[in-house]
Amino acid sequence: MTSSIRRFVTSDTGVLFWMACGGALLHILLNGQYGFHRDELDIIMNARQLDWGYVAYPPLTPFIARLGLELFGSSLVGLRLFSALGQGVVMFLTGLMARDLGGNRPARVMAALAAYIAPVALTAGTLIQYMAFDYVWWVMIAFFTVRLLKTDDARYWLGIGVGIGLGMMTKFTLAFWVAGLVIAVLLTPARRYLRSPWLWTGAGLALLIYAPNLLWQIQHRFVSLEFLNAIHARDIAWGRTTSFWPEQLYVSTNPFTLPLWVAGLIWCLFSPSGKRFRALGLMFLATLALLALNRGRAYYVGPAYAMLLAAGAAWLEGWLESRAVWLRRIGRGLAWTLLIVGSIVGIVLIKPVAPINSSLWNTTSNVNGEVVEMVGWQDLVAQVADIYAKLPATDKPHTVILAGNYGEAGALDLYGAAYGLPRMISGANSLWERGYGDPEPETVIVVGFERGYADSFFRSCEYAGQVTNRYGVKNEETKFHTGLYVCRQPRQPWAEMWKTMRWFQ
């Protein structure tokens, strides 16, 4: 080992690097249980149909998933590798933010771990979906903003611009983070950067990166705005936004880190030593307020807390350094006890570690409803395959499978070929634009609809089974619209029916 490598390994930055590698590795080791989540199945399905945009989200996540498919096939752990690595990056950048905010090595390690154990971060490190990478870009923007404020080097606007461009190519809610940044710049001395060519170059860079999806939106009449409005109205109607404030304490952040990020926010806003970083506190509060006023989902704010955790850890270690030895020991002992307990609780409740139907599973699945949506997809496809196998041979050439939601569609797309299943169609999101095929279907296996809905489109519908899974786990597939039907004799030409068969999910 050369002296330069040895110095890096033992340096403060090296410690953060190895810690980030360890965090990513832990995700990789724990990501192999159960199966794909419904959201992952949708991403993988679109990864097999690459485009510069999709109804529900921008294209970057499907592009990353396509790389995973090329490298690892449909491996659960392989496809989730990129999400795990993303959380390693989040740990590393959070530690570096603590450094730039004045934190020593213990503060940097503390901040990195505190960011890692947030429930939304643990979920982001588990699933190959847009939230995983959106999280990275939020933290990346925060990191470059901290560097900008610390060094007064306007060239960091280029890094901010890259983060914004990549973020807008991943998830549209990044616009709230950008709005928070703009408000913070306008309300603080950072507005001096408005005269800097580097800021406008960064803005141009962001627009250049986002341009492919922007052009796609123009070509498709901004269908994603229509989708977002519909989904937002649905979320409000279903009460998904009513717990925005309490979920800041146990979804967006780990409750055991509450003292840390609160201290960080107070330090940024009010401490004389934090005056240079006032913009960070305002950036956070503006983003939080905008999302609350727009009745957004609580977890959208999650990555914004990383910079506050970094500030809180830096302040805590600085405060303890000036105290008596006994007080330092008590303070650090208490802080690390909270972090260790929070880590254990967070990992057990959020990561897919509990054996299905064990007593631990019963607890974790009640707390974290996402895990039940990782169970039963291959069983569903096998049931559909059994129905298809029983059809008369003369019907099979003109048979399609109509899927009610993107999870069912994604499962049929991923696993259907192994069973020799026919074409899958759906009116969900981007699938509607891919049409019903040619020639027109004559026999349709209907999955994920109530009988009455199927009857409204077909004169003949026969009950063919009910969705179950081998574990008896109750999830959306086994609780709602569980009937499987074989339908024939469309009531209208397919071209007319298809106009009314579009839905957003």
Spell out what each predicted region is.
Residues 328-397, 407-410, 414-420, 427-429, ...:
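Membrane-proximal, lumen/periplasm-facing interface regions of secretory-pathway glyco-
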Residues 81-102, 140, 144:
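Transmembrane-helix motifs of polytopic, lipid-linked glycan transferases
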Residues 120, 126-134:
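Short acidic/glycine- and proline-prone juxtamembrane loop motifs at membrane-interface regions
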Residues 144-165, 196, 200, 204, ...:
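Short hydrophobic alpha-helices at membrane interfaces in multi-pass membrane enzymes
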Residues 99-102, 141-157, 266-272:
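Membrane-interface transmembrane helices that cradle and orient dolichyl/undecaprenyl
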Residues 20, 111-119, 164, 168, ...:
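Short helix- or helix-capping micro-motifs
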Residues 4-5, 9, 13-18, 94-117, ...:
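Transmembrane-helix signature of polytopic, membrane-embedded enzymes
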Residues 175-277, 347-352:
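Transmembrane-lumen/periplasm boundary regions of multi-pass, lipid-linked membrane glycan transferases
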